[in-house]
């Protein structure tokens, strides 16, 4: 073996392990509750933290030393406070998808411990543990990863008074976010996991949303009970990698059939070493996992169902893209959108954007390039197209 290659690859592999240990120590802090218990505005000592949580003082001090060096906490007045960086990993974080990813990796560590059983038996850890993983994973991981999509729905056209169906809703966390953001929404969720549905129903009651959100048990691949245009919007997040590849196109077409205005779904694309590694670990976790899209498959399925617009999600950019397909049958020339200022319309027409759908499917970067705020210019079009 070449000595230079040995040296280079050894350094690379060592760095990978070091980064892995940082991630594991961070996940340990989340699991132990440190990020939730350390205040951001009032110092707490290691002794106080150990007593409050019932933990060994020496181990708490070791974790605090790590957290201080990595920037999660800062030392002041004889104690520790949480930094902005650390606050992103506590409950109520403004970036729930980030917290969800950390929880996801905590499950991956469990999957690794049972790799031999999963590989020999051809099943996932969820089967080996009789469904325990699935029950816990959805509220802690999947629900957190889904919340970031609510802003995209609004940008695409979802408004107060509309109806929406969430296929593979888990505990309904996304629907609760939608209901909080847009009062008056009528929401329905369908999922096969009875445990998470019951958890979601309890949360709906706690928040007074039980009359606004209807959670139903059912097979998300069977939409025959819903008539055409049954809902204004239909949505599926992190569902496709649990569907057989040969059923994915039909699933999208059924979503299109039962939607009045449009559909949303995401495609996780195995286009990097990160997603390829996650693909391996999810297959170890779940028996019914069928895999991410290749880039070619993702593009081809959108082409076959005539998707008009797609956009990338903010956190896992380039690896998970959220797609919107408009099913509303009519369109409007921009000249008939009453609240759209003439000067803005002229700028759009100069870029050959002449209809409401044309504006909604235009690249946000293009709108910025011609001096228009994407959110502002879309609002009158959304009101006109989706009453």
Segments (PLM) and residue ranges:
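Conserved Class I S-adenosyl-L-methionine-dependent methyltransferase catalytic core
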Residues: 66-162
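Conserved SAM/SAH-binding beta-strand->alpha-helix loop
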Residues: 193-195
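A conserved beta-strand element that flanks and buttresses the S-adenosyl-L-methionine
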Residues: 235
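Conserved beta-strand signature within the Rossmann-like core of class I S-adenosyl-L-methionine
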Residues: 260-268
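Compact, charge-rich alpha-helical regulatory domains located at protein termini
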Residues: 330-387
């Amino acid at each position: 073996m070449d000595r230079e290659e040995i040296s280079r690859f050894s350094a690379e592999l060592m760095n990978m392990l070091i980064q892995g240990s940082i991630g594991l120590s961070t996940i340990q802090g989340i699991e132990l509750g440190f990020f939730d218990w350390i205040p951001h505005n009032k110092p707490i000592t290691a002794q106080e933290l150990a007593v409050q949580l019932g933990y060994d003082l020496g181990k708490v001090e070791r974790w605090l030393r790590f957290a201080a060096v990595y920037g999660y906490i800062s030392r002041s007045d004889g104690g520790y406070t949480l930094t902005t960086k650390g606050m992103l990993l506590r409950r109520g974080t403004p970036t729930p998808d980030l917290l969800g990813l950390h929880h996801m990796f905590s499950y991956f560590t469990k999957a690794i411990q049972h790799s031999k059983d999963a590989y020999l038996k051809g099943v996932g850890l969820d089967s080996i543990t009789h469904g325990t993983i699935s029950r816990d994973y959805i509220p802690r991981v999947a629900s957190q990863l889904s919340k970031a999509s609510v802003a995209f729905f609004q940008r695409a056209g979802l408004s107060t008074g509309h109806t929406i169906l969430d296929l593979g809703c888990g505990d309904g966390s996304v629907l609760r976010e939608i209901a909080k953001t847009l009062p008056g929404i009528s929401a329905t969720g369908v999922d096969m996991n009875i445990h998470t549905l019951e958890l979601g129903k309890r949360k709906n009651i706690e928040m007074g949303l039980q009359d606004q959100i209807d959670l139903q048990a059912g097979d998300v691949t069977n939409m025959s009970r819903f008539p055409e245009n049954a809902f204004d919007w239909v949505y599926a997040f992190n569902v496709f990698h649990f569907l057989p590849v040969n059923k994915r196109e039909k699933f999208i077409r059924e979503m299109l059939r039962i939607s009045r205005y449009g559909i949303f779904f995401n495609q996780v694309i195995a286009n990097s070493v990160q997603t390829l590694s996650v693909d391996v670990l999810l297959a170890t976790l779940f028996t019914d996992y069928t895999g991410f899209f290749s880039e070619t498959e993702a593009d081809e399925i959108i082409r076959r169902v005539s998707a008009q617009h797609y956009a990338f999600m903010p956190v896992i950019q380039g690896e998970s893209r959220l797609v919107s397909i408009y099913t509303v049958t009519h369109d409007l020339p921009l000249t008939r959108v009453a609240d759209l200022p003439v000067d803005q319309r002229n700028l759009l027409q100069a870029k050959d954007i002449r209809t409401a759908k044309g504006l909604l499917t235009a690249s946000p970067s293009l709108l910025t390039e011609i001096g228009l705020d994407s959110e502002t210019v879309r609002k009158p079009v959304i009101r006109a197209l989706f009453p």
